[in-house]
Swiss-Prot record:
Lineage, uppermost ranks: Bacteria, Pseudomonadati, Pseudomonadota, Alphaproteobacteria, Hyphomicrobiales
Catalytic activity: Exonucleolytic cleavage in either 5'- to 3'- or 3'- to 5'-direction to yield nucleoside 5'-phosphates
Protein name, entry field: Exodeoxyribonuclease 7 small subunit
Assigned EC number: 3.1.11.6
GO process terms (BP): DNA catabolic process
An MF annotation (GO) of this entry: exodeoxyribonuclease VII activity
UniProt function note: Bidirectionally degrades single-stranded DNA into large acid-insoluble oligonucleotides, which are then degraded further into small acid-soluble oligonucleotides.
Family: Belongs to the XseB family.
Main location per the UniProt record: cytoplasm
Amino acid sequence: MAENALADVKTLSFERAIEELESIVKRLEDGKVPLEESVAIYERGEALKRRCEELLRQAEARVEKITTDASGQVTGTEPLDVQ
């Protein structure tokens, strides 16, 4: 697949990337796409998946857990441990 077609993936929002990825999955599952086109859209799907994962990692890094003291007063924030 052309580099410029994959490069535009880097500018997509999470919502747009996931929407396009879902569309690609449906097309591939349908089984009516010629082999060459299947390979090309699969490659784009991989790029979209990586973009979504990247955006999710960035969002997780921005989420913080609010910490409180014994009386319930907010004392600050710390990174949220989601594992």
